[in-house]
C-alpha cells in the first residue's frame, strides 16, 4: 500500500456526508507532542479514519492509529520499543451543550471557527493517552531481577536507630 500523508485539518460534517474513508500516515516529524512524551518515535503513525452520519444524524469519526515508539523502562532505565495501538470514535461539536447531549459511545471533538477539526492534534492526543503511565519492560526482559525489587519491610541494615530515643530516656527521669 502506498503511504499517503493525511490532511492536517478537515470539515468532519462535509466529510461524513460524503462517507469518506482515509488511510494514511503522519511522519515522526509531524507528531512533535508524541516525540516529547517518548524517547523516540520509530515509525510513521499509521491511521485509518472512517466518516459517516449515524441514525441520529450526527457526524461520526471512527478510526485507529498505530505507531512504534521507544520508551525508557522505569525499573532499569534502559530503552525498549513499544507498539502503541489506539481506537477512537468522535463526533464534532461546537459547544459544551452539544457535547453534553452526545450519546455515551461518542467522544466530543470541538470544531474551530471554520467548522474544521485538527486531525493531527486528535491523533496525537489519542496516542499520548494510549502510552503506559509507567513504562516497564516485561519481567523476563528487564535487567532488574525480582530479587532486586524490595517490597514491604526494609532489610535490617537499612533500619536506623530512632534519634529521639535519647529524649524518651530523659523524659523517664
Curated annotation (Swiss-Prot):
It comes from the Bacteria. Induction: Part of the yceD-rpmF operon. It holds the Pfam family YceD. Keywords: Ribosome biogenesis. One of its GO terms (biological process) is ribosome biogenesis. InterPro entries: YceD, YceD_bac. GO terms for cellular component: cytosol. Plays a role in synthesis, processing and/or stability of 23S rRNA. Belongs to the DUF177 domain family. This is Large ribosomal RNA subunit accumulation protein YceD. The gene is yceD.
Amino acid at each position: 500500500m502506498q503511504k499517503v500523508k493525511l490532511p492536517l485539518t478537515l470539515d468532519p460534517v462535509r466529510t461524513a456526508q460524503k462517507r469518506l474513508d482515509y488511510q494514511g500516515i503522519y511522519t515522526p516529524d509531524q507528531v512533535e507532542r508524541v516525540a516529547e512524551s517518548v524517547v523516540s518515535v520509530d515509525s510513521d503513525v499509521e491511521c485509518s479514519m472512517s466518516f459517516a452520519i449515524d441514525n441520529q444524524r450526527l457526524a461520526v469519526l471512527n478510526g485507529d492509529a498505530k505507531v512504534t515508539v521507544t520508551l525508557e523502562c522505569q525499573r532499569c532505565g534502559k530503552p525498549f520499543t513499544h507498539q502503541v495501538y489506539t481506537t477512537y470514535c468522535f463526533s464534532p461539536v461546537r459547544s459544551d451543550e452539544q457535547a453534553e447531549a452526545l450519546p455515551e459511545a461518542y467522544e466530543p471533538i470541538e470544531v474551530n471557527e471554520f467548522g474544521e477539526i485538527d486531525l493531527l492534534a486528535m491523533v496525537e492526543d489519542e496516542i499520548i493517552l494510549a502510552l503506559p503511565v509507567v513504562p516497564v519492560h516485561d519481567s523476563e526482559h528487564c535487567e532488574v531481577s525480582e530479587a532486586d525489587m524490595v517490597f514491604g519491610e526494609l532489610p535490617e541494615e537499612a533500619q536506623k536507630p530512632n534519634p529521639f530515643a535519647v529524649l524518651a530516656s530523659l523524659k523517664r527521669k
